[in-house]
């Protein structure tokens, strides 16, 4: 890992905050998507079965993104991959509402899965580097921040949906 957090940032607190921010963003994006699934289903007029098929795109993307991220992290450093994957995850979250059919929703979710799977691996690799600098277990704090992000993303997504804003 040529560009790990441990080698690029001096103060461990700054590195911890940076990685925690990525965990929060990842959780918020996931939380926001989950609460908008019914709206996307309704907008596309998908049956429960058709939605289930389309949702299969997310784990398909994860199957690609997870190993891709590991390879990319070795080649370019997990810090760089984390940044690119976070931007990609946020960008691909905009695709499901733009889908015009179950097939395009599936394709959008494959891309979302690739990006979010890549982010998951890269940010956890960064978290391991930060944890090593602390010389004590702190990994659970990153995962707690992910959960907090999920809560925040769900709350915002739910509030926006309640206001009648389309997916």
Where are the regions a protein language model picked out?
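Helix-loop junctions at membrane interfaces in 12-TM secondary transporters
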Residues: 97-108
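Helix-to-loop junctions at the C-terminal end of transmembrane segments
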Residues: 63-78, 161
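Residue-level signature of mid-helix packing/kink "hotspots" within the transmembrane helices
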Residues: 31, 58-67, 150-151
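Juxtamembrane helix-start elements in MFS-like secondary transporters
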Residues: 15, 37, 46-55, 139
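Primarily marks hydrophobic transmembrane alpha-helices of the MFS/SLC 12-helix fold
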Residues: 79-89
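Pair of pore-lining "gating" transmembrane helices in MFS-fold secondary transporters
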Residues: 8-38, 42, 110-111
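Helix-loop-helix hairpin linking two adjacent transmembrane segments in secondary transporters
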Residues: 142, 146-167
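Cytoplasmic helix-loop-helix junction between adjacent transmembrane helices
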Residues: 109-144
């Amino acid at each position: 890992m040529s560009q790990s957090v441990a080698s690029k940032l001096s103060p461990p607190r700054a590195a911890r905050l940076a990685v925690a921010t990525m965990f929060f963003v990842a959780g918020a994006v996931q939380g926001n998507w989950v609460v908008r699934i019914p709206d996307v289903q309704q907008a596309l007029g998908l049956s429960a079965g058709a939605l289930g098929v389309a949702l299969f795109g997310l784990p398909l993307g994860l199957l690609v993104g997870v190993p891709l991220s590991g390879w990319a992290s070795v080649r370019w450093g997990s810090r760089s991959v984390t940044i690119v994957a976070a931007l990609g995850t946020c960008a691909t979250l905009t695709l499901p509402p733009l889908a015009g059919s179950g097939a395009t929703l599936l394709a959008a979710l494959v891309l979302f899965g690739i990006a979010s799977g890549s982010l998951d691996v890269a940010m956890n690799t960064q978290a391991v580097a930060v944890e090593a600098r602390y010389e004590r277990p702190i990994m659970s704090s990153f995962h707690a921040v992910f959960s907090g992000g999920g809560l925040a993303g769900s709350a915002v997504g739910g509030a926006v949906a309640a206001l009648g804003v389309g997916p």
